[in-house]
């Protein structure tokens, strides 16, 4: 990532929520495109704003679960509008965790401790959780032995509380940013999508946009880490004017993708979802189908 690592100020966050809810948005994804959400020392203040906002119905986020402590995990159980939080686990033991994440043994120990703490808390509290597990392709769910505290903790959570567990052994190329050279020496495969056909605009630029920490509005919340698909800036524009057919930058992006013209980050992206193909992931997330004409009508009303 080339952009500076910054944390969104609370005042900007509050303003975004106010503008978005006035437009009719009521569910919010809080995960930054890169980085750990709990690195924001004031994150719980943001959550409190969402909890007390009359027009916010729900929110969700991902975490690598290495930054929290027991007190923070317990605070999550008091959140009424948290629809689900997803834990991203990398590796299956200390060695694989360190090699994949480039973090140290302290971070590994903290992750295992937090998973064990979560297991204890869930015996007395109700939290909607899912776990995404990414590790070596040769891993076969070993849980025995002193070095398998991580895999043992993950399996125990799944079995004890029926937590959805999604295991991935193919790694995304992040729009061509990640290549096989980046995982050299690791038992990992990077998905190569240089030849993936792209027909029509990507559906993500219609429903999965993101406000960056600096106020830029980016048309992709999934893989465009450097905001090359930015369509506006809240430091000088209203959100209603950015998500509108009055915003020529946004309209040009849609039109160019409809013509089959994709920017470099999109050309190599393995996360592309054509508006002309209903993807199975939408069934999992219960996404209703919307036509392009209906989208244009919505933007016209903004």
What is each residue range found by the language model?
Residues 211-212:
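Short, acidic, Ser/Thr-enriched surface-loop or helix-capping motifs
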